[in-house]
């Protein structure tokens, strides 16, 4: 048991014939999911509390003893950034329909700019953002983190960076970023 709020898993199906891949069923949580990172449906104090709660839960996630909960072999510790760059480059190449010079430049630039030094290793979510959280119906309290398919052992700073990415994206062209707010 940890302080990380997750929906309880009810069943796992490993038969690919059912829906084309493995899947699991989890409990239903009655709560709120905020799709827009500006959280326009709440006031400023509530918005601050929501983001404070995200930070609190992220710290709890990264404080989990992977050995203590039996996850020491959950992923490959070390080289997290290189593994992620390789994974996303392969996925991009598999779905690429035309050459994008900006993406090509990024794919070339990233491997040469991986942070130097020893990476911290923790349980990371891999997709830690506001709309992957279920909040209590009336309180700014996370009752469940969703979408764990990218979770692994890796550098916890990557989760923090992913969470903060919304602050860098503009709020235009269908992107719900927070830059300039």
Predicted regions and their residues:
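Active-site activation/catalytic loop segments of kinase-like enzymes and analogous catalytic loops
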Residues: 158-181
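Conserved protein kinase catalytic core
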Residues: 17, 33, 133, 142, ...
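ATP-binding pocket architecture of kinase catalytic cores
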Residues: 1-123, 136-140
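Residues that scaffold the ATP/ADP-binding catalytic core of kinase and kinase-like folds
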Residues: 36-37, 145, 163
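Catalytic-loop of the protein kinase fold
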Residues: 123-125, 130
